[in-house]
Structure formats: C-alpha cells, structure tokens
Amino acid sequence: MKSNTESLAWENLRYDLHSWIKEAISSMGYPTMTPVQASTIPLLSGNKDVVVEAVTGSGKTLSFVIPVLQKISDRLYKPDSDGDLPEPVKRGHMLSIVLSPTRELANQIQSVFNQVLQYLPEDKGTRINTQLLVGSIGNVREDLNQFLTNQPQILIGTPGRILEFLGSSQSIKTSSLEIVILDEADKLLDFSFEKDVINILKKLPKQRRTGLFSATISSAGNTIFRTGMNNPVKVQVKSKNYFGEQSNSPKSLQLSYMMINPELKITTLLTILSKYQYKKAIVYFPTCTSVKHFYQIFNKVYQQESSDEPLKFFSLHGQLNTKSRLKTLDNFTQGDINLYKHILMTTDVAARGIDIPDVDLVIQIDPPTDPNVFLHRCGRTGRANKVGRAIVMLNDNCQEEDYIGFMEVKGIFLTKQDIPTSSATKNLHENFQIKLRQYMLEDRARHELAVKSYVGFIRYYSKHIASSIFRLATLDYLGIAKMYGLLRLPKMPETKYIDNSIMPTDGWLGEIIDMDKYSYADKLQEKTRLENLENDKLKKIQDAKRRKELKIKNEAWSSKSERKENKLDRKEKLKRKREAIEKQIMEEERLNDGGNKDEEDEVVEDWKDMVRKNKKKQKKNNSIQGSFDDL
C-alpha cells in the first residue's frame, strides 16, 4: 500500500502536464502535491468547471496557476494531428483572466505565475506573458498600450479595473479566452464586487472553463450559479483538529482566544510581541485610522526592554495608495528576520490569499464583523503544513465569549488562553498609560486621531453580523476609550449605554485640561486654530450683543402694545360711564315729566358741566401719558 506522501507525488498526477511545467514545479521545491492540487489540477486542466473550497494555506494558488499555464501551453505549443503548430494568438486577444478582490493578492498571484514562467524554455518562440490590472497604478490608457505592445495572454487584476479595461477600446477582444479564475470567490461574489464580476463574465465566451476558489466558498450560496459554469465539480478539502473533529482550519494552525479587559489589550499585545518566539507577525486592527493611530504610538511611545529581541513595525491599510501598499508589503516580506521581529499592522486588506513566508503569529485585536473573514485572517500563518499560531482578543465583562460557540458551529474551534499577569506586565501597563497620556498632550492632532479611531471602532462594532453577541448596550466604552488613549469621551449617541454611576464628569477620563490651550505641534495648524478660536470668541460676543438688542426691541414693542391696550380700555370705560349717565338722565326726565322748566334747565346745565369736566380730565390724562412716552 502506498503511503500518503507517495500517492501525492507529482508523477502520480492523473493528468499529463507539459514537461516544462513539471520541471518548474520540481525546481521551485514542491516534491509532492497537496490534496487540493491533486484533486483540482486534473479537472481544471481538462474540460471541467470547478468550485474549490479548501483550508487556508493548502496550495489553492498553484491549483489554478498550473491548469491555466497548461491550457495556454496547449494553445500555443501543442501540435495538431498533422504535426502543425497552432496559429499565434491575434493582437488584442487574451487567453485567461484571473480576478482577485484586492490589489495585494492580484500582485502576489502575478508573482506566482512569473515564478513558474521563469522555467519556460527559450526555444518555445512565443513567450507567455502576464499583465497586472489594478487601480491606482497608471491609468487605463497606459494599460491598453502595454497590452497591445506586450500581448500578454494572462490578465490578472481587480474587478473594477478589469471591467474598465475591457470596455476601454474596440481593440480588446475576449473571443479567444479559454479559462477564467475567481480567487477568493466568496468575496468576489458578495455585494461589493458582484455587479462588476457578473458584467465581466457576460463579456466572455460561454464555451470556457471557470474555476472558483476560496476557503469559505459556501458563503457565496446560489450566487455561484450566476458565473456561467457548466456542471461544475465541487472539490472540498477539510482537516481535522487535535480532537479529531472536522475543521475548516488547517491542522498545523493553533487557534486560541483571550478574554481581556479592553484597557489592557494594547499592553498585552506588546507583551506577546516582545516575549513570544516568532519571525513575523500580523496584527489585525478594525479600521484604517486605528492602524495609523497605533502605528504612531508603537513607534513613539513603546520602549522595549534591552533584553528583548528588537521589533520593527509596518503599517498597511486601505487608505494608502497602491504603490505604498505594495512597497510596504514587499518590505515586510523581504525584511531580514535575523535583525528584527517583523510586525505588520493591518486591516482586512491583508486578510485574504496573501502568502507571506515566515509568518508564525497572527493576532486579532477584535474579531472581524464578518465571521467568514476570521478564518482568512488566521490563515496567513500555518500555511503549507508549517506550524502557526493565531490569537483573537475578546472583550471581557460582556457577551463576546459566546463568539467561541458561534464559530464552532462553523467548524472553527478555539482554545482559551490566559492573559499575561506578571508584575512586569502590570508595570508595563502603568508606565505605558502615563507615557500615552503625555504623548497625547504633546499634540492636539494625536488626540483628534485617537477620537476618530474610537468613533470608527464603535461604528465597526455596530455592523457585526453576529449582532446578538456583539451588542452596543454591553460594550465597555470607558475601557475602550482608555485603550485608544482618549483624554475625554466624545459626544455621541452610544454614550447613553454608559451607567450613570461610572460616567465621568463631563466625559473627562483623567485630569481636566483647558481645551483652548490644547495646541497642535504643527505651527501652521496651530496658527489656524488660534485664528478660528479668536473668530469664535468674536462671534460669541456679537451673537450676545444681537440677542441683547433683540431683547430690548422686543421689550419696547411689548410696552408700546401694552400702552395701546390701556388707552383702549380707558376709552371703553369712559364710553360706558357716559352711556350710564345719559341713561340716568333720561330716566329722571321720564319720572319728572311735567315739572317746571327751571329744574329741567338746571339738569341740562349740570350735564354740560359734567361733560366739560370729563373732557378736561381726559385731556389731562393724555398730557401725562404723553410725558411718559417721551421718557
């Protein structure tokens, strides 16, 4: 009976590869196939569409690189039955497209193709070329000129740029295309890329081979049937964990978790990075701003013990331009591990497919919002049967420990790991917090970045798919604020979840500082701040003056209105009084009807005197009122 190693020898592959490809594989140091390669290469090299789901680090990239090169070699070099060589590929035509969700992964895939193509014999005549098509590197016009000049048979890139490229000129023809590959297919078929990917596939001939590859392809669901595959064969390769349970992670990868107070996360991370034995590590942060924030802190605040092996930090995130990202990734990959321990601080931009040698350790400061990404992050280590370690930090005193059971349902098993509790770790935390506060006080811009990172994390947390576990109502807002180095809590709706008994006065997390005197280190920025501060003060004074004037104006209008109302009341009273007197006189006349005329004349005269007195009194009142009006 053959051993497993013997059965996976390349000579036992159930498909006859071109001799130059066999030589390339041998020269590159791959004595045996991986299970996914042994299953996939014969199918895809033949006439089968495939959907491949295999654990991270299982050799999926070579599983499609070899079939693509095999098919192109057949098209370019394989004689027909009469011994005649095939016709050259027409100008403007391509034979294969490989799609990737990120620029970094596309760049890496091209590197693998080019490594194999180094072994293509010179006497083959027509060379097999590749071209990288990703955003932020050159423009589509430059891509088109390069394509028409070099005539590459293989296009590798991100969906947006490839779709733009295919529609940029009538000189580009897809009718000769033979095979298309979707690497990290579950990501390419989610809402962020699906439209572009489907539009690309519509431009390609229906009689083609299609390969979908991912560690979590099952999450793509029924979307895979929109890719135009014909009776695809599903290749699924899983491993068993140390307990013999079926697992979606490689056996060589040790997965563990820590329950930790968020305030202690950063100093615990630094302790692990200083004390653990590894060559290269990748640390995943939730947002781009948090990567920038902690990258600055680690380089300016953290001081290692002289006995520890020196650390070198690298920053990689989506807000960097493509050239900077590729340069950082190259520096991290090519760095001398004999001089430093290399630590890449990154986001999910480096979570999928990227194969970096010597990565022994992966740490996640927080779990990803999408549980499927968890395995992709961890899979940057423990690749190709090499031992790797992955740790995820979960916030204590809330429901996050339920995440472990949630991941077990998905076939991912984690063991609990204790946090470092030595006196040295406690001293590190105390000293680090003092230095972190001083670092923040030196430059207002640093605190603004810290606040931006904190707010970004809260938004990130609120978008978690497992919302029943990651709940805003149970989050330790104060502990996280201290972790990010905040001096004061920002005003945001989520602070309503903080219990009033622990809510700091006016949001201050330490000694109160005068924000008007809290300055920027940058002189130009500080000058602008002071000018804005002065303008704000003037505006406040002007606003107060306007409010006072408006108040006086409103009061004057109110008094005038009141006087008018009083005058009308007096007139009404006088009218009623006059009517009452007239009524009384008429009543007396009626009773004394027939009396002597002298009495009547006397009554009339008395009435006239009364009217004159009333008029004089009214005139006097008006005169007095007028004098008050002049005041």
Swiss-Prot record:
Keyword annotations: ATP-binding, Coiled coil, Helicase, Hydrolase, Nucleotide-binding, Nucleus, Ribosome biogenesis, RNA-binding, rRNA processing
Domain of life the protein comes from: Eukaryota
Binding site residues for ATP: 54-61
Enzyme Commission number(s) from the entry: 3.6.4.13
Gene: SPB4
A cellular-component GO term for this protein: nucleolus
SUPFAM superfamilies listed in its UniProt record: P-loop containing nucleoside triphosphate hydrolases
All residue ranges annotated as the Helicase ATP-binding domain in the record: 41-235
Localization of this protein: Nucleus, Nucleolus
Protein name stated in the entry: ATP-dependent rRNA helicase SPB4
Family assignment from sequence similarity: Belongs to the DEAD box helicase family. DDX55/SPB4 subfamily.
Chief place where the protein resides: nucleus
PROSITE patterns tied to this protein: DEAD_ATP_HELICASE, HELICASE_ATP_BIND_1, HELICASE_CTER, Q_MOTIF
Region (Disordered): 583-631
Function recorded in the entry: ATP-binding RNA helicase involved in the biogenesis of 60S ribosomal subunits. Binds 90S pre-ribosomal particles and dissociates from pre-60S ribosomal particles after processing of 27SB pre-rRNA. Required for the normal formation of 18S rRNA through the processing of pre-rRNAs at sites A0, A1 and A2, and the normal formation of 25S and 5.8S rRNAs through the processing of pre-rRNAs at sites C1 and C2.
Motif Q motif: where in chain: 10-38
Catalysis: reaction(s): ATP + H2O = ADP + phosphate + H(+)
Intervals of motif DEAD box: 183-186
Segments forming a coiled coil: 525-594
GO molecular function terms noted in the UniProt entry: ATP binding; ATP hydrolysis activity; RNA binding; RNA helicase activity
Residues annotated as domain Helicase C-terminal: 265-429
Record field: compositional bias (Basic and acidic residues): 583-597
InterPro entries: CTT_SPB4, DEAD/DEAH_box_helicase_dom, Helicase_ATP-bd, Helicase_C-like, P-loop_NTPase, RNA-helicase_DEAD-box_CS, RNA_helicase_DEAD_Q_motif, SPB4-like_CTE
GO biological process, one term: assembly of large subunit precursor of preribosome
Domain notes: The Q motif is unique to and characteristic of the DEAD box family of RNA helicases and controls ATP binding and hydrolysis.
